């Protein structure tokens, strides 16, 4: 007997087939069984026991779907090497699903398409617009870095061999493969796979990706839910994370703050007001490293409220990030993502939450440099949020050693970043190759976080329909956070949890 039915089965199922076929009298019954068999597995090529580099592969009968294709961030040489050498079989990869437009989730899409991926990339309309912006900004930064390093090498008489990961043309090619899908609309992305997005409440356009995989029989359907990054309730501008997702059999769950409890969202504005008042009394500048997407717009929203209500005086507030400026424009044309309060402000009362007299968006390099010659008090909001690139580095270098100034940290800082060193209160830090004493006050507001903490994630789990839930796969978290969250999940009624390891395959069916 020729066992042609082994084609496209996993090694596990091939072994099963051999065992079942050992008794020839069951030949016809077993063939029928194998025709109905699905082979579904899952593995991660990033954000496995770390936070950055999200790349998750769902394999269905030998065909692959990737969820997110993000860049690694942190130690520069190590991250650069990992970003250049991630191993994806583009001939097996049918499609990519993008949960949101943060660089650690979308940053390597141009590398993937350069490697030969020709399929569709699915995203919400707002995510597509923001991802285009993020990827193009990265291409520009890499081009500038390459030119700077080339000049340095020439000056030192050294050989220069560093090249950007991708260029503008690569970004355009990747963007052309993006297919948009609005929230809560079904789309077949394969004959047996339906995709549906639900609002994740993390940033504008962020989504939970619900995949329904059809078996031979109706009751064989399997639902796999990828959370991407889970947001928090009661954040300004965007809606709360959806709890209307179809009952999942498996959840690939983030764990960024698996060991941390945030301050209540409602205290963010009060804490911001107190820090600003102290800095004004000292006559200093308030330097805020902020992600260009969501965090900057949220800060602008809060500053608008504080000035409007006369809680703080009207001091100059500068947003010094071309990408943040462009992102704010994108926010203004995607009201489908707004919560009711923001929706009504824009569309009913015609009031712009992202514009007021004290606010100035800085565009030119000359104007950015001139801020360092101005006296405080003033607020400068600039990217990158982890202090690894962008104009924020120049503002830190010019202001970090002045004791009148305040550095306000309002977001997640990955390991081995300048932002993490500032958060750890190091007394001296290296910025753009030079060492600086940290004399400025370092302040932190945890309430701004766009990630749910461990209690908020379990509250969300308790609110969705988990009647079919068989297992949780934990990703997107550092080891310490994941170990704590693993125990917390067990204590709260979720005993079937795997902490995902890089490259390790987990059988679903």
What residues fall within each predicted segment?
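Conserved beta-strand hairpin/beta-sheet module of binuclear metal-dependent hydrolase folds
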Residues: 39-87, 95, 208-227, 250, ...
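Cap/insert and terminal regions of metallo-dependent hydrolase folds
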Residues: 208, 233-320, 406-411, 429-492
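Pre-active-site segment of Zn-dependent metallo-hydrolases
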Residues: 48-50, 60-119, 123-174, 232-241, ...
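Short, Lys/Arg-enriched N-terminal segments with co-localized hydrophobic residues
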Residues: 23-37
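Metallo-beta-lactamase
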Residues: 138-203, 335-374
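Active-site neighborhood of phospho(di)ester-bond hydrolases with catalytic His/Asp-centered motifs
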Residues: 69, 93-102, 109, 121-124, ...
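Hard-cation-handling environments
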Residues: 275-415
């Amino acid at each position: 007997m020729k066992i042609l039915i082994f084609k496209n089965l996993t090694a596990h199922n091939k072994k099963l087939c051999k065992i079942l076929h050992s008794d020839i009298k069951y030949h016809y019954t077993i063939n029928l069984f194998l025709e109905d068999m699905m082979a579904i597995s899952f593995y991660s090529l990033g954000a496995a026991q770390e936070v950055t580099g999200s790349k998750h592969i769902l394999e269905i009968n030998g065909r692959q779907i990737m969820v997110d294709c993000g860049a690694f961030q942190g130690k520069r040489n190590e991250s650069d090497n990992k970003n250049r050498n991630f191993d994806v079989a583009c001939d097996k990869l049918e499609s990519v699903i993008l949960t949101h437009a943060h660089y650690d989730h979308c940053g390597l899409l141009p590398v993937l398409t350069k490697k030969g991926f020709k399929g569709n990339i699915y995203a919400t309309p707002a995510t597509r617009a923001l991802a285009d912006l993020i990827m193009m900004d990265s291409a520009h930064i890499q081009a500038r870095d390459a030119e700077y390093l080339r000049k340095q090498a020439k000056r030192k008489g050294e050989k220069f061999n560093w090249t950007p990961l991708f260029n503008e043309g690569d970004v355009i090619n990747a963007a052309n493969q993006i297919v948009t899908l609005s929230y809560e609309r079904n789309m077949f992305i394969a004959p047996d796979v339906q995709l549906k997005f639900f609002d994740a409440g993390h940033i504008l356009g962020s989504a939970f990706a619900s995949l329904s995989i059809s078996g031979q029989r109706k009751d064989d359907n399997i639902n796999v839910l990828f959370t991407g990054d889970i947001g928090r309730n009661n954040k300004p501008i965007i809606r709360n994370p959806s709890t209307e997702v179809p009952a999942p059999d498996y959840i690939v769950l983030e764990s960024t703050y698996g060991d941390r409890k945030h301050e209540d969202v409602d205290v963010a504005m009060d804490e911001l007001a107190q820090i600003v008042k102290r800095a004004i009394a000292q006559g200093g500048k308030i330097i805020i490293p902020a992600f260009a997407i969501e965090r900057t717009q949220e800060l602008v929203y809060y500053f608008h409220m504080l000035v409007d209500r006369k809680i703080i005086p009207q001091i100059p507030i500068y947003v010094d990030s071309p990408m943040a400026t462009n992102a704010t424009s994108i926010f203004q044309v995607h009201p489908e993502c707004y919560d009711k309060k923001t929706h009504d402000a824009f569309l009913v009362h015609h009031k712009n939450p992202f514009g007021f007299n004290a606010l100035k968006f800085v565009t030119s390099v000359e104007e950015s440099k001139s801020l360092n010659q101005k006296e405080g008090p003033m607020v400068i909001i600039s990217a990158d949020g982890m202090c690894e690139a962008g104009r924020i580095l120049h503002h830190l270098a010019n202001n970090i050693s002045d004791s009148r100034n305040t550095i306000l940290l309002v977001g997640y800082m990955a390991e081995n970043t300048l932002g993490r060193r500032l958060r750890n209160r190091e007394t001296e830090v290296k910025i753009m190759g030079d060492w600086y004493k940290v004399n400025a006050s370092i302040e932190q507001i945890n309430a701004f976080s766009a990630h749910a903490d461990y209690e908020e994630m379990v509250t969300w789990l308790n609110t969705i329909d988990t009647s079919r839930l068989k297992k949780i796969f934990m990703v997107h978290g550092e080891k310490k956070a994941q170990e704590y969250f693993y125990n917390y999940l067990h204590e709260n009624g979720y005993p079937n949890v795997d902490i995902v390891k890089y490259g390790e395959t987990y059988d679903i069916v």
